[in-house]
Amino acid sequence: RLAHYGLKYRQKILLYGSPGCGKTMGAERIAWNTGLPLVKVRFDAMVSSYLGETATNLREVFETAAADPCLLFIDECDALAKSREDAQEVGEIKRVVNTFLQLLDEYEVTNGLLIAATNLTKFLDEAVWRRFDDVIEVPKPTDLEIRTILKQTLAAVEVGSVDWDTIVHRLNGFSAAQIVKIAQNAAKRAILDREDLVIQEHLEASIKDVIVSHAG
């Protein structure tokens, strides 16, 4: 099925873009479309204060992913490079980065994919960049994508009268994560209002809440 979507076997992809732009959603969608189980790990959570364990943790993740074909998704992959700013840990961090590079070189799972994501490209080690077959920017959602995200998020609830063109226009420039949150909050508002349908007013109020929270 990978070939059907124009993806090579053993392909390694790096996604980059601003926070919340939809990198994780993109990886999840690829996993769903290709039928591959998703193995997801965050590097910022893996790199603990005791860095001596990090290389071991890395190997365990890659061993798990290599056991069966899957989509290995590595989020916040810049976390290792960012940690090098701490001069007291430079030696250990270099060892961890070298381990990661070695694991990327060795990662060969038939019909599997490896996707990494980062918000901070300037902090990512150049040697890491070179390990990926494709480097793809994930921009803010287009109007069509905004509409799709809204309708998919609200698919499990009844939706009443909504001027989608107006809502989409208001959400232009919002991140995918913000759009999902707005749709979810609109559904919660409908429940609190004891309404059977999510309507225009619920979405408008949710948009206003996000704008106000960011302004504060």
Model-derived regions: residue spans:
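Walker A/P-loop NTP-binding motif of AAA+ ATPase domains
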Residues: 1-165
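C-terminal alpha-helical "lid" subdomain
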Residues: 143-216
